[in-house]
């Protein structure tokens, strides 16, 4: 594999994002401000990951036309659940053997009404974005599952009023979001993922999160044939008290019979023993050869990252006085049609850890896997993406490292990044 940091652009030429900044007439001041804060960085991710110049322009225009108008007022007034800093957008890179990194965008659409009396729980922006994406005519884009989970988890008018009487999102709950989107940028196409959070529905109705999710998944059995696999997961989650207000569901926005389901959640016990337990679903799938192989690599990555073990006091966001080391472990179980059991994925919190040391640990792990190109190029890639930051001093540019292992494709690692030019610390921090 050639260097994915090489570019077809001549040395010294202007980047596509710089050219678009010069020529695009932004319809609002908010959009212009969001572009200057997130657009050039997005452009550096595209270039750094090895996308050719034509594809860079394609995805930059998609960003300007579809994401930028849905970022809401600048600076952000709505604290999103999808990032440690509360920003409504996150970039990530996925790494696999013998391929260039794949860039993804995680995104919660916002509007000027988000969090106001007109739209206290941010429904308007999601509906507007779904309508916009339908007009773009993306390849294989389908909203069946989005509509299904929105119908099951969205708050009714009566539930909204009940939640407001409890104090709304200014009360005890830190979960503010109901839906979010993911965009995979591959092969000149945009693949869409949907996310739905059950926390607010739980607070408004008193129905346990696990029951909300289980009831919703059960309705999909005639088309997705995933109930047996889900039942293994649900049995473990119920007996280990694993469901909580942070649990949520994800799916591919394609035809329902071809989509995967992913169940997410968090746990404050950041210890290897808890990771091992959750990877094997409390021992339920520990004899599976793929699970064993993945667990061995997962333990090696854990040892390289040297994450402080202990019980995290996660209450949303991060605390400035402890370097941000309050983030929990995030887990994810993927359920495919006909699969005998869920496939685990873990997200290790590195928000608050030294970015240079984290990049070295990632590089060492790539070397252990025999991914020599990724190992050699990753530290340079991080500096290329954040040229104005001294990564030997920063601690919050890389937020999470996720790891999964599949029988046919092997290891699968992603890194999640801060997605704005503003530093994720100091007086301009999103509160």
Swiss-Prot record:
Pathway(s) annotated for this protein in UniProt: Secondary metabolite biosynthesis; Alkaloid biosynthesis
Function: Reverse prenyltransferase; part of the gene cluster that mediates the biosynthesis of echinulin family alkaloid. The pathway begins with the biosynthesis of the cyclic dipeptide cyclo-L-Trp-L-Ala (cyclo-TA) by the NRPS criC via condensation of L-alanine and L-tryptophan. The prenyltransferase criA then catalyzes the first prenylation step, a reverse prenylation reaction at C2, to yield preechinulin. Preechinulin is the substrate of the cytochrome P450 monooxygenase criE that catalyzes the formation of the double bond between C10 and C11 to produce neoechulin A.
InterPro entries the UniProt entry points to: Aro_prenylTrfase (IPR033964), Aro_prenylTrfase_DMATS (IPR017795), DMATS-type_fun (IPR012148)
Keywords for the protein's UniProt record, in alphabetical order: Prenyltransferase, Transferase
Enzyme Commission number(s): 2.5.1.-
Pfam families from the UniProt entry: Trp_DMAT
Reaction catalysed by this enzyme: cyclo(L-tryptophyl-L-alanyl) + dimethylallyl diphosphate = preechinulin + diphosphate
GO biological process: alkaloid metabolic process
Enzyme class name: transferase
Site positions (Required for regioselectivity): 106
This protein's name: Reverse prenyltransferase criA
Source taxon at top rank: Eukaryota
Gene name, Swiss-Prot/TrEMBL: criA
Subunit structure: Monomer.
Sequence similarity: Belongs to the tryptophan dimethylallyltransferase family.
GO MF annotations in UniProt: prenyltransferase activity
Binding annotation for dimethylallyl diphosphate: 104, 193, 195, 262, 264, 347, 412, 416
